């Protein structure tokens, strides 16, 4: 299940990006990058390269087993993801005073059900279909493919080991 471009834009407009790291910020990052939930949780300020407008995906957060950094899902999951300038501007303010090696979003016990219910509320607020955080990953991929980006490029961006996964 995924949103179209108009639905996504409406939902993103409902996010509250004032203040420090929050579920709304994580939702924005997943929507704009297609990261897996565990990859987004594993992000630290030092993973963001503002000069090159990239995000380095090199670890995940083990939210299912009480937390801590663990390796990515597979070797292909280690990657650099290009960020758009608007997201770079937004994130530079968010990250500037945070400790460089600490997770931005993983504080204490983390449940994906919490992130999913926050996202569901935003979807309902603007009258778009309710999707999960993983659905945002599908949304990101679908919009790229619809815009004419090759399956190979989308596959690399998502960290898939095989293009077959992307096509499914």
Positions of predicted regions on the chain:
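C-terminal catalytic core of tyrosine-transesterase DNA break-rejoin enzymes
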Residues: 2, 28, 32-39, 121, ...
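Basic, Lys/Arg- and aromatic-enriched nucleic-acid-binding interface segment
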Residues: 1-43, 51, 97, 137
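Short, contiguous acidic/charged loop-to-helix segments that flank catalytic cores in large enzymes
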Residues: 15-18, 68-78, 104-110, 127-135
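Exposed loop/turn and edge beta-strand positions of beta-sandwich/beta-sheet ligand-binding modules
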Residues: 23, 51, 77, 99, ...
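Short functional hotspots where side chains directly engage DNA or cofactors
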Residues: 52-57, 106, 132, 143, ...
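Conserved tyrosine-mediated DNA breakage-rejoining catalytic core shared by Y-recombinases
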Residues: 5, 42-93
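Active-site/catalytic core of tyrosine-dependent DNA strand-transfer enzymes
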Residues: 2-8, 60, 84-129
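Short basic/aromatic active-site micro-motif
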Residues: 22-24, 108-112, 129-148
């Amino acid at each position: 299940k995924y949103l179209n471009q108009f639905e996504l834009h409406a939902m993103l407009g409902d996010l509250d990006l004032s203040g420090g790291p929050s579920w709304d910020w994580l939702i924005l990052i997943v929507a704009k990058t297609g990261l897996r939930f565990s990859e987004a949780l594993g992000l630290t300020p030092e993973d963001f390269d503002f000069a090159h407008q990239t995000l380095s995906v090199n670890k995940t957060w083990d939210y299912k087993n009480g937390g801590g950094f663990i390796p990515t899902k597979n070797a292909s999951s280690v990657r650099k993801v290009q960020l758009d300038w608007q997201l770079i501007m937004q994130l530079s303010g968010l990250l500037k005073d945070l400790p460089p090696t600490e997770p931005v979003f993983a504080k204490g016990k983390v449940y994906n059900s919490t992130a999913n219910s926050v996202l569901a509320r935003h979807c309902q607020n603007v009258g778009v279909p309710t999707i999960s955080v993983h659905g945002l990953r599908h949304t990101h991929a679908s919009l790229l493919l619809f815009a004419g980006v090759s399956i190979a490029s989308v596959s690399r961006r998502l960290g898939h080991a095989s293009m077959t996964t992307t096509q499914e």
